[in-house]
Amino acid sequence: MSNPVVLNLHLISDSTCETVAAVARSALEHFKSVEVNEFVWSCINSYEQIDKIMLTIEKDKYNFIMYTMFDDDIRKYLKQKAGIHEIPCIPILSHVIREISCYLNIKKDPYINTSIGLDDEYFTRIDAINYTIAHDDGQNLWDIDQADIIILGVSRTSKSPTSIYLAYRGYRVVNIPLINSIELSVDLSKMKNKLIVGLTIDIDRLIEIRRARLVSMKNQNNYGYVDYEHVLMEIRETKRICAKNGWPIIDVTQKSVEEIAATIIQYFTKMQH
């Protein structure tokens, strides 16, 4: 088997890097065979900072820069430095801004406030992240009634990364693993005004993921974890529980975390109305 292509992806912004990171990760979903080393450079607003970034870049590797930069002089300097080292340097918003400017025949603002505001939305997001981390993998269910969303599923169905992604969007999430022969410690059927959703996956894909997990943990002797009949029983039980309670179930086999989260948000929004 040939070695995967390794890409050093440098995300540069004069703000938080949230926008450029979201675009970059969505784009890289189309290149599953590429191994990405992500470097995040936020709050970059001086020539000196750009010089330091360039010094850290290993020039003999595959490097790629994606950025958002609103100061024209700093942006030109970044492009110049990247060009000297023959590193692709892509502005993710320039084309969109230019198209809007041309269509409306209005020049873009010379300056926008890119500072991180500590507003209510910020604190809501931080609270959601803290809550979700504390309730990962079925922990601390004593205050599960404070959750917005409850995610169920067998092991390795992207429950945790999906929960964190949703938390970053401001949702308080609990994720609970479904394990054969072990009953849930809480009665979810009595939960009111909570979105409860199950995650399922193709059995062959799940076994493949679990085998890789066992190898990484050097625990290949855990045969039950990857036994076909055992795994099939787990998946069927998840579907049975969700069907019995009328909870939606999402097949995550061909979905990214972003796609899973988007589907859950659609269910949540529909429930709210």
Curated annotation (Swiss-Prot):
Q: Name one Pfam family in it.
A: Kinase-PPPase
Q: Which organism is it from?
A: Ehrlichia ruminantium (strain Gardel)
Q: Which reaction does it catalyse?
A: N(tele)-phospho-L-histidyl/L-threonyl-[pyruvate, phosphate dikinase] + ADP = N(tele)-phospho-L-histidyl/O-phospho-L-threonyl-[pyruvate, phosphate dikinase] + AMP + H(+); N(tele)-phospho-L-histidyl/O-phospho-L-threonyl-[pyruvate, phosphate dikinase] + phosphate + H(+) = N(tele)-phospho-L-histidyl/L-threonyl-[pyruvate, phosphate dikinase] + diphosphate
**What are the alphabetically sorted keywords of the record?**
Kinase, Nucleotide-binding, Serine/threonine-protein kinase, Transferase
State the protein's name.
Answer: Putative pyruvate, phosphate dikinase regulatory protein
Superkingdom to which the source organism belongs: Bacteria
Q: Name one GO molecular function term.
A: ADP binding
Residue numbers binding ADP: 153-160
Record family assignment:
Belongs to the pyruvate, phosphate/water dikinase regulatory protein family. PDRP subfamily.
Q: Which residues form a coiled coil?
A: none
What is the stated purpose of this protein?
Answer: Bifunctional serine/threonine kinase and phosphorylase involved in the regulation of the pyruvate, phosphate dikinase (PPDK) by catalyzing its phosphorylation/dephosphorylation.
**Enzyme Commission number(s) of this protein:** 2.7.11.32, 2.7.4.27
